[in-house]
């Protein structure tokens, strides 16, 4: 079964709030289950093949969530994805406000609910990966990783690639690359909702370190990434109009 075609851009779709909440809860549960399978069930902690198995399992559920996003018409587990989409669509302040003040809080609440459920069912999943470096080092790492991921994600959307497999494959491999590179520093989260949910479970969700590293840095990186892609990728209509006006002048 193929994903449903994406809805037209720039529309406020209230039903996505429920979809965001459910998908965000499912996402944190999926990530926790993969870690539990790799380090608990398979006992690969500290072994070189642990990362390979983790990547393979993660790619499977990343494809599932990409399909789920298309099937639901845009439900997402990551506030940065919603924010980047609203900014890149140029649909005006209403869509941006809907994303920032309705959809993103729903994703945060869904992530918290997911963490509570998975920890109640499987206490061995732990409380997530806390920041293991200084706050400024962590903010730089999380911001840079987010910036690189946003650039590729927004570019793929603007190019409107028709192949679901290839588009998802490129995006997933790119995300996993930067997740692995930053996993020993910040956990490689690149998802404020998920990071907040695990921090809430640990009780450090209101600290300055958490807000700077997992919220301010990735949000700024998202804004910068969307701006860079928008600057470098000129819409075809604008290019055609510029060519036509140039031809008329000649």
Curated annotation (Swiss-Prot):
GO terms for cellular component: membrane. The chain crosses the membrane at residues 14-34, 55-75, 95-115, 132-152, 178-200, 211-231. Expressed in leaves and anthers, and at lower levels in roots. A motif (NPA 1) lies at residues 78-80. It is found in: Membrane. The keyword Repeat applies. Disulfide bonds: none annotated. The keyword Transport applies. GO terms for molecular function: channel activity. A motif (NPA 2) lies at residues 191-193. It is a multi-pass membrane protein. Its main location: membrane. It comes from the Eukaryota. InterPro entries: Aquaporin-like, MIP, SIP2-1-like. Keywords: Membrane, Repeat, Transmembrane, Transmembrane helix, Transport. PANTHER family: AQUAPORIN SIP2-1-RELATED. Aquaporins contain two tandem repeats each containing three membrane-spanning domains and a pore-forming loop with the signature motif Asn-Pro-Ala (NPA). Belongs to the MIP/aquaporin (TC 1.A.8) family. SIP (TC 1.A.8.10) subfamily. Aquaporins facilitate the transport of water and small neutral solutes across cell membranes. This is Aquaporin SIP2-1. It comes from Oryza sativa subsp. japonica. The lineage of its organism: Eukaryota, Viridiplantae, Streptophyta, Embryophyta, Tracheophyta.
């Amino acid at each position: 079964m193929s994903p449903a075609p994406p809805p037209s851009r720039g529309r406020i779709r209230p039903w996505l709030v429920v979809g965001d909440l459910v998908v965000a809860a499912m996402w944190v549960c999926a990530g926790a289950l993969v870690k539990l399978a790799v380090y608990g069930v398979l006992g690969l902690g500290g072994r070189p093949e642990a990362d390979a198995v983790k990547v393979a399992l993660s790619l499977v559920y990343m494809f599932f969530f990409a399909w789920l996003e298309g099937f639901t018409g845009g439900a997402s587990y990551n506030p940065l994805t919603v924010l980047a989409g609203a900014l890149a669509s140029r649909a005006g302040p209403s869509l941006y406000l809907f994303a920032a003040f309705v959809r993103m809080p729903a994703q945060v609440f869904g992530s918290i609910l997911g963490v509570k459920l998975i920890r109640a069912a499987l206490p061995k999943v732990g409380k997530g990966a806390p920041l293991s470096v200084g706050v400024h080092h962590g903010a730089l790492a999380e911001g840079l990783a987010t910036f690189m991921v946003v650039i590729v994600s927004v570019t793929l959307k603007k190019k409107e690639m028709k192949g679901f497999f290839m588009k998802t494959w490129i995006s997933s491999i790119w995300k996993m690359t930067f997740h692995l590179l930053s996993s020993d520093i910040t956990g490689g989260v690149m998802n404020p909702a998920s990071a907040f949910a695990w921090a809430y479970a640990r009780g450090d969700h209101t600290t300055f370190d958490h807000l700077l590293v997992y919220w301010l840095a990735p949000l700024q990186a998202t804004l910068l990434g969307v701006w860079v892609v928008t600057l470098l990728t000129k819409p075809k209509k604008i290019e055609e109009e510029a060519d036509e006006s140039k031809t008329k002048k000649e």
